[in-house]
Structures are given as C-alpha cells and as structure tokens.
C-alpha cells in the first residue's frame, strides 16, 4: 500500500510539474520579454522573397519597395493590403481585444518591429511576381467596408501587362475570418499564357526557449494527403526546407490562440515548401501551372484564414485545419470535453459556470472509479494489522513475506493496486481538461464573476488558488492514509502547499476546475465513507 501511495504522489507531482512548466513557457513574463527583444532586433521587408516557379532553380531577391495601402473591413476582420503585390500586411481581429478592457483590436498579421505577413501571387512563364519586382495593383478606393445587411464584399485589384489583365480579388464574408483570394487572368493576346499561383506566410524567425518537457509552440504547420497535421517549427525550417508534393493540403503559422493559413485549390496538385532567409521564416504552397489559351481567361482560387482558433469554422474552411487547436496526445479525450464545454456554455452563457458544469459531469462519470478507489483503500487499511504481524513474523525473508501477502490479498479479495489505478486512469482526463482550457480561445478575456474577469489569466488576488489549497488540505485530512514512512508523510503534508504555490500563476479557469473537482470529491468521499462505515470498514483517518 505504501508503494501505491508513493506512485500516486509521484504521478500527481509529475502532472503538476508538467503543467507548471507549460504555463511558464506560455505566460512567463521574462520569456515573453526575451521574445519581444528578439522580435524588435529584426526589421525585414514585407515585400519580395517570392518563391521560384516549378521550372526554376533560383529564389527571387528581396524587394523592399512598398506601394500604398488599402483597408478592407468586415464586422469581425480588418485587413490592410499593400497594393505592391497585393500582400496582406496587417489583420485586426475586431471581436478580440489586444488586452483585457482595451478597445484596441488584436493585431495578428503585422509589419514593423515584427514581420508577420501573408503573401500571394503568380510566378512562372507569364507570372507577374518576378526578379524585376512585384505588380503594382490598381484599386478603385482606399477603404472598403462591409455594409449593413450585406453578407459578402468583393474587392478587385487589377494589373495589366503585355496585353494580359490580372485581377486579384479579396472576398470578405460577414462573421468569418475565411477570406477568399482569387486570381483571374484574362489573356487578350494571340499567344498562350502560363502562370503558377503561390501563397506564403512570413514571420520573424524566433529562437526556442523555455521548458524541455512541454514547450509552447509558435511556428509553422502543414497538412498533406499523407499527413493530416504536422508541425514544422522555425528550427525545423533552419535545418531543412520543406518540399512536399500533395493534392489539396494547407500551410499555416500558429501561435497560442490564433492562426494564419493559406488553403490552395483542394482539387489541385500543390507543392508545400519552407525556407529561412535573413532572419525571416517562410512557409507556403505553390500550385500547378495554369495555361490560358489566347483570348480566354482562367480563375485560380485560394483561401486565407487569419483569425482565432475557431474549431467549427476552421473545420468548415478546410479539412484538418481545426487540428491546429492542438490538444497533444490527449486529443481524443479533449475534443469531446470541449464539445461538452461549449454545449453547457450555450445554456448557462458563462464560461466559468460551463467549467463547473463540465467538472460535475466528469466527476459524476468517474464516480464508480472513485468509489472503487476508496473502497479498495479502506480494505487495505483493514489489512494493515495482519500485514504488520507478517513483517514481525518473517523479518528479512522478503520472498516468504511477498508470498504470504499475495495469499492474504487473494483470500480477502483485495487488489493492492485498486486504490491507485483509478487515480492513474483519471490523470489523462485531467491533462485533457488542461489542454482544453489552455487551447480554448473562447476563454480568452472571458469573465466569471466578481474579480475573475479573464479565465485565461491568473487570479489577480490569488483567492481561487488559496481556496483550492484549502480544499486539497481538507481532502487530504479526510482521506485514509496508511503511510508510516516519515519522508512520505512529510511529502503528503506539504502537497497542498506545493500545489497552491504552483496554481498561484495558473489560468483561473484551470484553478476553478481543480477547486470544483476537490469540492465534489469531498462530498463524494463523505457519502462513500458513510456507506463503508455501515459495512464495518473503518475508512476514516483516526
């Protein structure tokens, strides 16, 4: 039984350590300051660095020239377009504030101290994105706003060269972060025209830092016919360039709650690529060659997602794009938990209450395991006098002692792992809940009650962590403990203190879950113990 308790302690401490190191990497101010310093140390061009066509071997040189900017605005998204090349050089997410209680929208794509842009264009035989430069598109006005009652807005930008009219059109939809970016090539000449589309995302190259166990992730990702979802970090890009031929697929740049992704024509054969150059990481796709006969035209489609990790809408945008909400190895548990969380929130209209609701549902489902755990521990406690008698009788004869103990367990129908196994089974569920709360953009700046105005941030007054520690201390006092080893006793005594310290800086949503879970467990234990005592099993601590 002592070994079971030791295993339980080590397991809980391991889970706590992993979660704490993950939080440090995600939110530690010192690390964030280091990242900001790294970003501000580099200023790179948002134009140029166009990929080579499939029949070329060179990369287009950087071009620092910039045209004028055009603003496109829907109800949830504001894009800033550079008319030189038609690149998206800024995206403001109007439904997400940069800071709590701020009226400034969150800026995802941006230029300046940090380069983070979405580029697209046409290369190839008659491509207009070449060594000589990028096309200077013409547009009717500088600002376009989606009107009331209008569900969609199309903004065409035109460029004409050698008798060929190129039109790049951005289509914004109400309530959506999915932007259609289409090229129409109208060949008004007597010769055949060949172009090849591309889309790429460029980001200032960041160095890895923080935890070795569960590092946070800001970097590239892609999907292909062979691989539904795979991360490709900045460090991976520095080591080797991606070069994958695939039908369909997409490329993306991820950060905590947000993602930018290019989704090419899903019926075409595309090439996924990456590279690093002058402190800039690039991940993109290149589509197949499109041939336009004389006096005809062709349209090449693509989609740009630049917004929050909205699983439902991303799933509708492209296959596997919702996998950018990365739940780690516990995804098969986390996905239904998130579905349950959103369902409850739709009823109670408060994410904090939804977390409490999810906790109640999970603890109710796990109640049979909890009951089995405490029943087994109570039975083990009843056997302690007999086990102690065996120790005195057999002394250092460990083999005989082990044989007699197994015989005793068999006679009494007690599983020595019965008290520990249910907890080990529940640990993956807790880890899945952790990732669910950490990855849910819905919890960002979501209020609970009173002083808790952001469930994704720490409790500013540390009230929830202290309550959690108190509930854990009470739970420990109620739990049967046959531990006699002084070291183990000290570890168990200080566990509530250690957990409280860990949770001081955890997101309040996660602390709320743990506090609620402890309170429910206290009630369940009281019911279980009362029932066990009626059966003559003295389970309470004396």
Curated annotation (Swiss-Prot):
Entry's transmembrane regions: 7-27, 338-358, 417-437, 455-475, 494-514
One GO location term (cellular component): plasma membrane
Superkingdom to which the source organism belongs: Bacteria
Entry GO MF terms: membrane insertase activity
Pfam families linked to this entry: 60KD_IMP (PF02096), YidC_periplas (PF14849)
GO-annotated biological processes: protein insertion into membrane; protein transport
InterPro entries: Membr_insert_YidC, Membr_insert_YidC_N, YidC/ALB3/OXA1/COX18, YidC/Oxa/ALB_C, YidC_ALB_C, YidC_periplasmic_sf
Entry keyword annotation includes Transport: yes
Cellular localization per UniProt: Cell inner membrane
Membrane topology: Multi-pass membrane protein
Keywords for the protein's UniProt record, in alphabetical order: Cell inner membrane, Cell membrane, Chaperone, Membrane, Protein transport, Transmembrane, Transmembrane helix, Transport
Role played: Required for the insertion and/or proper folding and/or complex formation of integral membrane proteins into the membrane. Involved in integration of membrane proteins that insert both dependently and independently of the Sec translocase complex, as well as at least some lipoproteins. Aids folding of multispanning membrane proteins.
Subunit structure: Interacts with the Sec translocase complex via SecD. Specifically interacts with transmembrane segments of nascent integral membrane proteins during membrane integration.
HAMAP family: YidC_type1 (MF_01810)
Stored PANTHER family: CYTOCHROME C OXIDASE ASSEMBLY PROTEIN COX18, MITOCHONDRIAL, OXA1
Family (UniProt): Belongs to the OXA1/ALB3/YidC family. Type 1 subfamily.
Name under which the protein is recorded: Membrane protein insertase YidC
């Amino acid at each position: 039984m002592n070994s079971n308790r030791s295993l339980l302690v080590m397991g809980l401490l391991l889970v706590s350590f992993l979660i704490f190191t993950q939080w440090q990497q995600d939110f530690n101010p010192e690390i964030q300051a280091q990242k900001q310093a790294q970003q501000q140390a580099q200023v790179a061009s948002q134009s140029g660095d166009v990929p080579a066509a499939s029949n070329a071997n060179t990369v287009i040189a950087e071009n620092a020239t910039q045209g004028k900017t055009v603003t496109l605005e829907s109800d949830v998204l504001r894009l800033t377009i550079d008319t030189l090349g038609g690149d998206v050089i800024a995206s403001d997410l109007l439904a997400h504030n940069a800071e709590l209680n701020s009226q400034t929208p969150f800026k995802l794509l941006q230029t300046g101290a940090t380069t983070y842009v979405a580029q697209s264009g046409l290369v190839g035989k008659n491509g207009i994105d070449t060594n000589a430069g990028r096309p200077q598109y013409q547009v009717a006005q500088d600002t376009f706003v989606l009107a009331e009652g209008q569900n969609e807005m199309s903004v065409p930008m035109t460029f004409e060269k050698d008798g060929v009219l190129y039109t790049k059109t951005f289509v914004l939809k109400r309530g959506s972060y999915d932007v259609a970016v289409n090229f129409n090539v109208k060949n008004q000449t007597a010769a055949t025209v060949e172009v090849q589309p591309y889309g790429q995302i460029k980001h200032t190259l960041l160095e890895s830092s923080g935890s070795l166990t569960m590092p946070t992730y800001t970097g590239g990702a892609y999907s292909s016919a062979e691989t539904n979802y795979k991360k490709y970090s900045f460090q991976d890009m520095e080591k080797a360039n991606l070069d994958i031929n695939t039908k369909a697929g997409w490329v993306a740049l991820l950060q905590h709650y947000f993602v930018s992704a290019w989704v090419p024509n899903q019926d075409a054969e595309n090439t996924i690529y990456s590279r690093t150059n002058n402190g800039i990481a690039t991940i993109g796709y290149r589509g197949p060659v499109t041939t336009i006969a004389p006096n005809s035209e062709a349209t090449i489609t693509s989609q740009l997602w630049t917004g929050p990790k909205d699983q439902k809408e991303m799933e509708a945008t492209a296959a596997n794009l919702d996998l950018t909400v990365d739940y780690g190895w516990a995804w098969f548990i986390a996905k239904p938990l998130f579905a349950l969380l959103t369902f409850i929130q739709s009823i109670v209209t408060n994410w904090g209450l939804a977390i409490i609701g999810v906790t109640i549902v999970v603890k109710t489902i796990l109640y049979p395991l909890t009951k089995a755990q405490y029943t087994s521990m109570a039975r083990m406690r009843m056997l302690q006098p007999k086990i102690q008698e065996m120790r005195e009788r057999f002394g250092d004869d460990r083999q005989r002692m082990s044989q007699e103990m197994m015989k005793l367990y068999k006679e009494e129908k007690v599983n020595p792992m019965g008290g520990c196994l249910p907890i080990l089974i529940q640990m993956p569920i807790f880890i899945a809940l952790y990732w669910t709360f950490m990855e849910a953009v819905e919890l960002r700046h979501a209020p609970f009650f009173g002083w808790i105005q952001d469930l994704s941030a720490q409790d500013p007054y540390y009230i929830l962590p202290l309550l959690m520690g108190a509930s854990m201390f009470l739970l420990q006092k109620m739990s049967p403990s046959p531990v006699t080893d002084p070291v183990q006793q000290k570890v168990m005594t200080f566990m509530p203190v250690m957990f409280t310290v860990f949770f001081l800086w955890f997101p309040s949503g996660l602390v709320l879950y743990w506090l609620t879970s402890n309170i429910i467990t206290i009630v369940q234990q009281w019911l279980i113990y009362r029932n066990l005592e009626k059966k003559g099993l003295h389970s309470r601590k004396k």
